[in-house]
Amino acid sequence: LPISLYELVDAQGRKEYDGRKLIAGIVDRGSYNEYKSDYGQSLITAYVKIGGHAVGIVANQRKRTQTAKGEVQIGGVIYADSADKAARFVMDCNHTGLPLIFLQDVTGFMVGRDSEQEGIIRSGAKLVNALSNAVVPKITVVVGGSFGAGNYALCGKAYDPRLIYAWPSAQIAV
């Protein structure tokens, strides 16, 4: 990867960055087609081409986003709407036979009363179920942190990805 991509992701994991810039640096120019860009914005899901090969990408958005209701969502955290979107995307890619690439920089799932009322447990279970049933090739790239249940939800080792790569500054704790 060009040095500018390595510089995009803070080695200490403290700096926000736009996950779309990370994706743009690794996919074929003009091949980016985002899935539900205005929904579940703490995860980015997109149909892309890498080296001419069509794949689906699921990546963390590491900058703060705002929902349609005006609620702020912290970057790197999986919310109920994001988990729902990613589950549907994984199922679609599996149905069409598209390999999946996961770009992890995740602190985990959002917790708390509000998250529970929004259905984080149900939505997280949907994502885990979709991933465990996916038979397409999967590759995981840890670009920043990968912690707790977030590691599993974004194709951690338990889901048997074909390859797991980690950037030099990556941190993994389950």
Each model region followed by its residue ranges:
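Ligand-binding clefts of soluble mixed alpha/beta catalytic domains
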Residues: L1-V174
